[in-house]
Amino acid sequence: MGYLFGKKSFRKGKALKKYKVNQGICCDGKYIYSVFERKKSHTCKIRKFTFDNKTIKVSDKLHIGHGNDITYKGGNLYITHSKGGNVIHVVSASTLKKRGDQHVKGFPKKISDHPSFNAIAAIPQGFALKLMGSQRIIIVNDNFKYIRSFKMSKKIPVSPQGMEYNDGKLYRVYSNFQKSKNKVAVFNMKGKLLKTYHIKVNGEAEGIFFCAHKFYMSIYHKYKKKKHKKKYKARLYYLKQIQ
């Protein structure tokens, strides 16, 4: 495990000055996309950048809620709104402009009358969505039509964050705020817990993505450099212990 950019933050540039909290993160195989939230305005921006931390593009202000998870598929970015109801925001990966919204079709009312989602991962069949306030994963096709669902077999007793899919398994990030007790839990596609990794790094784990046979985890690190002055860093880690 190690820093991808050494001690440098991947939140950089004047465009992100007021967008201090990194949220969801993903990769298209070449570029990395990270959501940054401006908490007081409840708006976000997306930074598209390279593996050597060079900015390709920063989006304009986006009304995408908390923006707590993001995934890439077919030229688009799909972003969870968290408490915004049955909606997934769609943003062009090339222009970083919003293209519209998707809604899960045929969602069973016996599961939830008012579903919302706080994690998303692209999978071969379509997408896996984490139902807000539940241990349930929803599987939809590429048109967001409901296929099936399952419950994760074990609740991890810290805050759930982003999610990634690879080789028939879901990788879910958990954090304990800024207490540096971060975890990655691995589940199969029936919800069975296969393994839990304990990641001891400074800050709060926010997201995870897989690229070129490697896993990476994003960290939101809040600290005080001077008295009464808070500093924020978005740091990216290579998780070499996860194969």
Predicted regions and their residues:
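Loop/turn-rich, solvent-exposed surfaces of beta-rich toroidal or solenoidal domains
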Residues: 154-187
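Blade-loop segments of beta-propeller domains
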Residues: 53-82
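A short beta-strand motif characteristic of beta-propeller blades
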Residues: 6-17, 54-61, 97-111, 146-154, ...
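Beta-propeller domains
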Residues: 2-3, 33-60
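Repeated scaffold domains used in trafficking and secretory/extracellular systems
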Residues: 18-26, 63-74, 107-122, 155-164, ...
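Short coil/turn segments that connect the beta-strands within blades of beta-propeller domains
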Residues: 29-30, 74-76, 124-127, 167-170, ...
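Structural motif
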Residues: 41-47, 85-91, 134-140, 179-186, ...
